[in-house]
């Protein structure tokens, strides 16, 4: 009869946090590579499994994010505030890069607009 059927597929992005966590995991397990004498990419450390098409690889190592580096735009971590009780990215152990850190307490007063 000349009629057409229309099928629409909708794709939705995954949760931003999940995407970020997955990328960070791949970054942390990326394989170091080098060019051999024939110009072919080979793995730097043959003790590890060869990377698959789903793995990240790199030739140049990442900069030291702990230190200020104007050429890469890294501000470093020196002088930043950290959270002593956190084991995450904002934690002092990770952020201070083994340099140690000073501790201090602050008292903050805020108007809470409480009504009694």
From Swiss-Prot:
The keyword Secreted applies. GO terms for cellular component: extracellular space. Palmitoleoylation is required for efficient binding to frizzled receptors. Depalmitoleoylation leads to Wnt signaling pathway inhibition. Disulfide bonds join 82-97. The keyword Endoplasmic reticulum does not apply. GO terms for biological process: canonical Wnt signaling pathway; cell fate commitment; neuron differentiation. Transmembrane segments: none annotated. Keywords: Developmental protein, Disulfide bond, Extracellular matrix, Glycoprotein, Lipoprotein, Secreted, Wnt signaling pathway. A lipid is attached at residue 1 (O-palmitoleoyl serine). One of its GO terms (molecular function) is frizzled binding. It is found in: Secreted, Extracellular space, Extracellular matrix; Secreted. Glycans are attached at residues 69, 83. Belongs to the Wnt family. Ligand for members of the frizzled family of seven transmembrane receptors. Can activate or inhibit canonical Wnt signaling, depending on receptor context. Required during embryogenesis for extension of the primary anterior-posterior axis. This is Protein Wnt-5a.
